[in-house]
Amino acid sequence: MSSSLVEVREPPPRRPWSPPRALLDVNVWIALLDDAHQFSEEANAFIESPEARIATCPLVENGVIRIMAMPSYSRGGGLPMSLVRQRLQQACASLDHTFWPDDVSLRDDTLVDFSRVQGHQQVTDLYLLALAVRDGGTLAGAARA
């Protein structure tokens, strides 16, 4: 098993001048959809690049809706789920977006080296990274304080 967390498989073919597609994590999406978010400016600068190519998956989409609809999301409370869903739909439609199904497993030793996971807080990121690498992309996440 390699020393990295994820075994790199042959990526799908892409145009040589295209950057890898970025699977945006929940934190990046929240920053994109909420102008009051502390990282909104950085997230928007990332996707406004002419080369920006993004991806979502069910895990990320569900997480965005769940978190932004929580009553404790902001001082004003959560947003209506239908509004968050609509914003997500509009953003995906306006960007170079593709949808990646959640179809990798952390039980797959050919895809991940689970022995390198140091704690429970890395499990979701490991899964998203495995999905992105398997599909020839990268994982774009917001820095956590």
Place the predicted regions along the sequence by residue.
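Short, well-structured N-terminal submotif of metal-dependent ribonuclease cores
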Residues: M1-T56, P71-L83
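Active-site neighborhoods of divalent-metal-dependent phosphate/nucleic-acid chemistry enzymes
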Residues: W17, A93-A140, R144
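Short, basic/glycine-rich phosphate-binding loops at helix/coil junctions
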Residues: P20, L24, R66-M68, L106-D109
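A generic structural signal for short hydrophobic patches within well-formed alpha-helices
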Residues: W29, E61-V64
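Short amphipathic alpha-helical segments and helix-helix/interface helices
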Residues: N44-I47, L88-Q89, L128-L129
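Short, mixed-charge aromatic SLiMs
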Residues: A52-R53, R85-L95
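Short beta->alpha linker loops
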Residues: L59-V60, R144
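A general structural signal for well-ordered alpha-helical segments in protein cores
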Residues: E61, V84-L88, D125
